[in-house]
Amino acid sequence: AIGKYDKWTETYYSSDSLNKMPVEYYTYPEYTENAKIDWKNTLRMIEFFSGKFGEYPFIKEKYGMALFGWVGGAMEHQTISSMGYTLVKGNGKYENIVVHELAHQWFGDAVSPESWKDIWLNEGFASYSEALWIENEKGKEDYIKYLKKEDYGFFQGTVYDPEGFIFGPTVYN
């Protein structure tokens, strides 16, 4: 992205303390304070998922979060995730999106499906990771509530239809 950004950096230490990496954050200046609140758990998320799925796959590089000009939405890229500026509110409302995009570092970037027909693996594991984070933070009851809430539209379509829309609820859930 090109533009005027504020940047700050934290340091993640691997569980064996043999490696460290920068975790870099880039925001538009007017969203920095909100982003610091909304993204405050990123290091803990990396630690949590490293415990669940194995060490962060790009430990020799970095991880980052960047704000960009979309009205909504988010996208992970290898070693950095981007979020639309309207998802940074300063109240943690969209933490599940931060979790989801981070989980793609393991499921989608370190390991990728051979074709689009298997995109459900990326999205399904990233969505499941949201539930795991909720369980870690809030307990089993909230974990189950979240899974039930996310059950909308499940099994109401094919996982892959080359003629149709492949990013629906069946793929993500």
Each language-model region and where it sits:
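Hydrophobic helix-coil surface modules that form long, contiguous segments used
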Residues: A1-V99, Y128
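Active-site-adjacent bridging/hinge elements
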Residues: S17-P22, A74-M75, H100-Q105, F155-V171
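Flexible glycine/proline-enriched surface loops and loop-helix/loop-strand junctions
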Residues: P29-Y31, V111-S112, G168-N173
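Active-site metal-coordination segments of metallo-dependent hydrolases
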Residues: D38-W39, S115-E123, N173
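Sec-exported extracytoplasmic/periplasmic mature domains
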Residues: S50-G54, F107-G108, E130-K138
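Surface-exposed patches in mature extracellular/periplasmic domains of secreted proteins
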Residues: E55-G64, E114-K117, K140-I144
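Catalytic Zn2+-binding segment of zinc metalloproteases
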Residues: L102-I119, L132
